[in-house]
């Protein structure tokens, strides 16, 4: 089972916010997930990001691959350094 850390879309049309979730890579974007580790609201000024650092590091240590967007959010929050 390939596990990914990715965004799950919520909100109204043209007003999205996202939950950062750990999911099987074969699951649909807004489908089943294994664990929720935070949220991202790009509409707020400034953009609002909240991530449970402990859970994020745990999932990264067991091999979960972050999506490109989540990777950039992790860099912004200082969770990964690349």
Swiss-Prot record:
Entry annotated with the keyword Ribonucleoprotein: yes
UniProt entry tagged with the keyword Protein transport: no
GO biological process, one term: translation
Annotated InterPro entries: Ribosomal_bS16, Ribosomal_bS16_CS, Ribosomal_bS16_dom_sf
Cellular component, GO, one term: small ribosomal subunit
Top-level taxon in the UniProt lineage: Bacteria
GO terms of molecular function: structural constituent of ribosome
Keywords annotated in UniProt: Ribonucleoprotein, Ribosomal protein
Database matches in SUPFAM superfamilies: Ribosomal protein S16
Family listed: Belongs to the bacterial ribosomal protein bS16 family.
PANTHER family: 30S RIBOSOMAL PROTEIN S16, SMALL RIBOSOMAL SUBUNIT PROTEIN BS16M
Name recorded for this polypeptide: Small ribosomal subunit protein bS16
